[in-house]
């Protein structure tokens, strides 16, 4: 079954120059059924991913965005209502990126 959502990352509490954050995401990602996927969204230099809560949304064609989860740290995260636990968030300080893991595709 083809599952091709558009996943968006938003930063919370963006003020001043931070509202001009530049985010880079791969244009596409392919994975086999049953496999896992790792989607990244990298922040521009000068903005530390460690300082922000990362929000992930799923948007399918013709539908509004659906909130999946937000992630600040392992002890401070929130899963959206009805969103399966196979969706999880993380951060990678070494690449300055927010990460969305999806298992069991």
Curated annotation (Swiss-Prot):
Residues 71-77 are annotated as: Complementarity-determining-2. Probable non-functional open reading frame (ORF) of V region of the variable domain of immunoglobulin light chains. Non-functional ORF generally cannot participate in the synthesis of a productive immunoglobulin chain due to altered V-(D)-J or switch recombination and/or splicing site (at mRNA level) and/or conserved amino acid change (protein level). Immunoglobulins, also known as antibodies, are membrane-bound or secreted glycoproteins produced by B lymphocytes. Immunoglobulins are composed of two identical heavy chains and two identical light chains; disulfide-linked. One of its GO terms (biological process) is adaptive immune response. It comes from the Eukaryota. SUPFAM superfamilies: Immunoglobulin. Residues 45-53 are annotated as: Complementarity-determining-1. Its main location: secreted. It is found in: Secreted; Cell membrane. Residues 20-44 are annotated as: Framework-1. InterPro entries: Ig-like_dom, Ig-like_dom_sf, Ig-like_fold, Ig_V-set, IgV_Light_Chain. This is Probable non-functional immunoglobulin lambda variable 5-48. Residues 78-105 are annotated as: Framework-3. Residues 1-19 form the signal peptide. One of its GO terms (cellular component) is immunoglobulin complex. Residues 20-105 form the Ig-like domain.
């Amino acid at each position: 079954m083809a599952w091709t959502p558009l996943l968006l990352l938003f930063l919370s509490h963006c003020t001043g120059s931070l509202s001009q954050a530049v985010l880079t995401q791969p244009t596409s990602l392919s994975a086999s059924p049953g496999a896992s996927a790792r989607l990244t969204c990298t922040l521009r230099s000068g903005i530390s991913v460690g300082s922000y809560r990362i929000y992930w949304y799923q948007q399918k064609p013709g539908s509004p965005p659906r909130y999946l989860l937000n992630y600040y740290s392992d002890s401070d995260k929130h899963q959206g209502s009805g969103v399966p636990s196979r969706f999880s968030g993380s951060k990678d300080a070494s690449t300055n990126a927010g990460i969305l893991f999806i298992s069991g595709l």
